[in-house]
Design a protein with these regions (language model features):
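Non-catalytic regulatory/interaction regions at protein termini and inter-domain linkers
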Residues: 1-213
Length: 214
């Protein structure tokens, strides 16, 4: 029987703010467990998460000042507007090591792929990133996080590949599930055979019908 991976995927459609309450609950729990929490997204989404954290009782200025909470819309991982896989992974690896050296249990990170990739929608680069990110999760056991895929802003092929590249799916703050469509790292490819099944699962995730994943 498999176990829930530390490298999870959230696929959604509609307003991104719908998932902020669930992410806030996860962040609160990770902070209680002495993890540093990193949230990467656009300036409006960072502001929105900050408001939801305040409403949930999190002392955001205090947590940010301490370095326990990092809310960032910095896009230095983009090179001339283009997603730089090496730069992004080096930044993430350094953040994990820094968190450990500063006494944290680990680093929990989440980012929206639409923001992380900028205007570029490069499928081969996405596959390279997710494959190497999965390797990083295996190398750094104190790293955990959620890759967010917004169906409304990403090409269908990228959303399908995002689904296939994650062993576990984030449903909400109390539920994650094993992914029946997970493709092992050594089998990563741009070609997917089960398009209809993938689309059915994506529809179920976006509509909140997680029971269909059994």
């Amino acid at each position: 029987m498999g176990h829930i991976s530390r490298h999870q995927c959230l696929i959604y459609e509609g307003s991104p703010s719908r998932h902020l309450p669930a992410l806030v609950s996860v962040i609160q729990e990770k902070l209680r467990q002495n993890n540093r929490c990193l949230y990467l997204n656009s300036p409006p989404m960072v502001a929105g998460l900050r408001s939801y954290l305040f409403a949930a009782g999190v002392d955001v200025p205090k947590e940010v000042m301490k370095g326990r909470l990092v809310l960032s819309s910095d896009n230095t991982h983009l090179a001339n507007g283009t997603f730089d896989v090496d730069r992004m992974l080096k930044m993430l690896s350094a953040a994990v090591i820094q968190a450990r050296d500063e006494g944290y249990q680990g680093l929990w990170a989440t980012g929206d792929m639409s923001w992380e990739f900028g205007s570029e929608k490069n499928l081969p680069k996405l596959l390279e990133y997710e494959w190497r990110l999965e390797e990083l999760f295996h190398t750094l056991p104190t790293l955990a996080g959620i890759c967010q895929y917004h169906r409304d802003t990403l090409p269908a092929d990228i959303v399908r590949q995002g689904l296939a590249r994650h062993q576990s799916l984030f449903i909400n703050d109390t539920l994650s599930r094993l992914n029946p469509h997970y493709v092992r790292r050594e089998c990563f490819d741009t070609h997917l055979d089960n398009i209809a099944d993938l689309d059915s699962t994506i529809n179920s995730l976006c509509n909140g019908h997680n029971q269909l994943l059994n």
